[in-house]
Amino acid sequence: ISQLNAAILQELGKEHTVKAFNFKRQYPEFLFPGKTQYVTPDDEAVPVESEALLDSIGPVSWIKSARKIKEWNPDVLIIRYWVSYLAPALGFVARHMSKKCKVIAIFDNVIPHERHFFDKPLSKYFLSGIDGGVTLSPEVGQDLEELSPGKPKTVIPHPIYCDHFGTKMERKEAENLLGLEHGKKNLLFFGLIPEYK
């Protein structure tokens, strides 16, 4: 998610004045299964200057974030949406922009693959605060239409990150790099991948 956000920011920044606002905390530690929810110096991430304001579980930060973004006076606010847990915070910010500011969401998911009883109501709350959306797949576009019929939307398939992950490598070169025998079938293990992926 962060790689695509950085790429979008870079591209839009070529022709527009852009500013990134960020989470100071996305998830409470007990809900976050990974090692860290922050970019570390070891990450090969595109550096993005951003202002960390929003705490997903801190309503006071929602008010401060909305105020700070509104003071910046954007014509368009682009919000990334991927999990309903963040809908209260993101929906609050979306609702508190000026009338002239269009609020557009980029959706990885409208309804998560691992569903909970609260997903649809929270997503509907978020959707009612935005002007339109970009979905990264047709299936997510269908979910958006189901929860918010007629909401302006377009589908732009999720891009490949050539700049972030490098160019395609020839098989022999990869086998040499990994110390594998040439021409053999190799099993690549990418960790535990949920069934829906």
What annotation goes with each model-predicted range?
Residues 50-57, 64-87, 102-106:
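Short N-terminal targeting/anchoring amphipathic segment
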